[in-house]
């Protein structure tokens, strides 16, 4: 039982990096001053976690990650924020990109390792962000979700990161597939391109009571387009 380890709880900021203890609960992510200021996408998405106040007050960011449940909310957001993780093992401490850890077998930690911290850079002041989630009821798991981070040069996309969750066993980072939109203006045609590319991105799809595979493929494109559209609008408001 690691629940009584105080060093795994809390949020700090030092030398331009934010460290979040693995046992920090979702409610803290929603309300912490550092997270709300520097990582507003994470604060917002933590409030969208299903299960009500019990899960928000007891569920932890580390548990959310290592459970590797495909319908959970936090992993796509942390991937869009380019998070690293710190892992403690008998041979020492290592740091790795979250995307690398998630891509490894299971959660990539092994039986003798422990996720201790999530490490992130603050979002840039000009960044726009959004988290879109489709779900059947207010407290249910998501059927499809997407996190987006953008920055603009005028009306042209200079940064575009999109990660789609709840449609496949693993979150899908669409950023490379959407690379061709960088330097292009955001308009209806760009939105249609995001939807088309992200709809075709999943190789295998979940098929369960939250939605069948055909519906999920369609919704992967929809949530991605909506997330980018909302993130662009956010960036435009921020930079007025």
Please provide the spans of the model-predicted regions:
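C-terminal structural segment of proteins
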Residues: 1-240
């Amino acid at each position: 039982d690691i629940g009584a380890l105080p060093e795994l709880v809390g949020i700090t900021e030092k030398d331009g990096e934010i460290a979040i203890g693995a046992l920090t609960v979702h409610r803290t992510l929603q309300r912490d001053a550092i997270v709300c200021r520097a990582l507003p996408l994470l604060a917002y998405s933590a409030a969208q976690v299903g299960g009500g106040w019990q899960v928000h007050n007891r569920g932890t960011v580390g548990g959310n990650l290592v459970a590797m449940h495909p319908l959970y909310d936090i992993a796509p957001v942390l991937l869009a924020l380019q998070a690293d993780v710190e892992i403690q093992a008998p041979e020492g401490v290592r740091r790795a990109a979250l995307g690398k850890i998630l891509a490894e077998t299971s959660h990539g930690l092994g039986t003798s390792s422990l996720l201790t911290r999530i490490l992130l850079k603050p979002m840039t002041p000009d960044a726009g962000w959004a988290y879109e989630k489709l779900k059947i009821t207010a407290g249910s798991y998501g059927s499809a979700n997407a996190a987006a981070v953008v920055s603009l040069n005028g009306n042209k996309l200079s940064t575009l990161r999109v990660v789609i969750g709840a449609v496949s066993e693993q979150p899908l980072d669409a950023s490379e597939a959407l690379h061709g939109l960088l330097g292009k203006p955001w308009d209806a045609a760009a939105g249609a391109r995001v939807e088309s590319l992200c709809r075709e991105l999943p190789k295998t799809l979940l098929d369960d009571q939250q939605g069948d595979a055909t519906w999920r493929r369609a919704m992967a494109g929809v949530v991605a387009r909506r997330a980018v559209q909302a993130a662009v609008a956010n960036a435009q408001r921020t930079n007025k």
